[in-house]
Amino acid sequence: MKCTNRKKNKVCVFLLALSCILSGCGAAKYDMPYDSNYPVSSFQLVQTDDFQIATPFAADLCVVDTNVSNEDVLLTDVGSAALFDTDGLNTLYAVNANEQVHPASLTKIMTALVALKHGSPDQMLTATENVKITESGAQLYGIKPGDTMTLDQALHIMLIYSANDVAVMVAEGVGGTVDTFVEWMNEEAEALGATNCHFTNPHGLTEEGHYVTAYDLYLIFKEALQYEMFNEIIQMTAYNTNYTGSDGNQYAVDIKTTNQYLNGNYAMPDGITVIGGKTGTTRAAGHCLILLARNSSGKPYISVIMNSDSTENLYLKMSDLLKAAK
């Protein structure tokens, strides 16, 4: 079309604009360098029939920001405790769940998680001088510098027997140094949203700046349960293997679980099956326990108690807590 006067020019402009709109020019976007200032915005509207929503970070997690009471539970003299319905995503009970406490050997859950994430079960580990832990009362298997075993073997001994010296062996074998491995532990905690905890070692012996919360332990334990090997180990009542000593000889391992439900020293609550978990005890942390359990319908729960005053009271209180797992 040829426009020959002002009136026709206006018509031409209108028709050209309409043509651009109908042909999609209205959806054009302008490319421009990110480091330059322009007086226009660059955007594009896309029409779709799909209905989409963003998935919240905690969409598959239980959440707790305050104490939660339960008529079936009456706990006293514990540092913190919580019971989580992992299918229904409900917090059934919580007391001081976000209070920072000493974790003792529950630290080893994070150690196992990071080792499984960064290592391979068949990789060989060699003990260094750093496995010599001299703290009084520390649970040790007794490995010596130069002893070797696979990560698979080490994780079994670390989780079932709660061996602190083997935790160091795992950290150095997988991370190269304890410091690097502990860095990974803290990075993993942050990635999981466990933002109220901080680790300074892989075993859980008391150190300044080494702390967790009951809720953060739930997050870490839940993630570790995604690994088949971790699931397998925490359910075992005993473990036997052989490792190679620094002298080249084979040494037998014969250990039993520290979980008093699994070894039969304490009866499981009626209608509850304890699948497995992790124990922890130090003078600063008291007696601690985290468990995966199922009720009579097979529904899974995670329960945790921190800083109980004795082993007996720990298991009595845990049995009381699990009564709410209906």
Predicted regions and their residues:
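Conserved, well-structured beta-alpha core segment at the onset of a catalytic domain
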Residues: 1-3, 19, 197, 206
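C-terminal motif of bacterial Sec signal peptides marking the signal peptidase cleavage site
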Residues: 20-24
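Domain-terminus/edge residues, biased toward the C-terminal soluble/receptor-binding domains
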Residues: 25-36, 194-195, 206-211, 215-326
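Sec-dependent N-terminal signal peptides
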Residues: 12-18
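Bacterial N-terminal signal peptides that target proteins for export
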Residues: 3-12
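Active-site-adjacent loops and short helices of periplasmic peptidoglycan-processing enzymes
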Residues: 28-215, 224-225
